[in-house]
Amino acid sequence: MRSFEFFEHTADVGIRAYGKSLEEAFSNAALGVFEVITDTSKVKPIEYREIYLNGYDLENLLYKWIEELLYYYDSELMVFSKFDLMIDQDSMTLEGKAWGEKFNGKIHERRTVVKAMTYHQLSIEKTENCYVITFVVDI
């Protein structure tokens, strides 16, 4: 199973992420976002940021997850390539770690700046075999 793919969207970037679990799908969604920013295969998981979030539904939790990661990119130039998280659907909480390093133009390719997560076309579906997350980021 592929981890994520991009789809065409006028002036923005659409991402479809997949995972056998909700956690894997959220991780792959984040990986897709950072693949827009840089080549994540060159991002070494040498530092981490702990993340604790709560939301009112899964879509809101995903929105907050991506926004939190983008906050670290905006404020510290952190780019991420590895994620370890747990989602509790009863309390609608997410806790985990995002692993990566500070962006370095000598090592990391500068692609496109992701300005923000959006609710446009945001959906989280559970199919027979996996979770499918669809969303659009503002560039």
Curated annotation (Swiss-Prot):
Transmembrane domains' residue ranges: none
GO biological process entries: tRNA splicing, via endonucleolytic cleavage and ligation
Listed SUPFAM superfamilies: MTH1598-like
Chain residues that bind Ca(2+): D12, D138, I139
Its biological purpose: Activates the tRNA-splicing ligase complex by facilitating the enzymatic turnover of catalytic subunit RtcB. Acts by promoting the guanylylation of RtcB, a key intermediate step in tRNA ligation. Can also alter the NTP specificity of RtcB such that ATP, dGTP or ITP is used efficiently.
Keyword tRNA processing (UniProt): yes
Keyword tRNA processing: yes
Annotated family: Belongs to the archease family.
UniProt keyword terms in alphabetical order: Calcium, Metal-binding, tRNA processing
Pfam families documented for this protein: Archease
Source domain of life: Archaea
Listed name of the protein: Protein archease
GO molecular function terms attached to this record: calcium ion binding
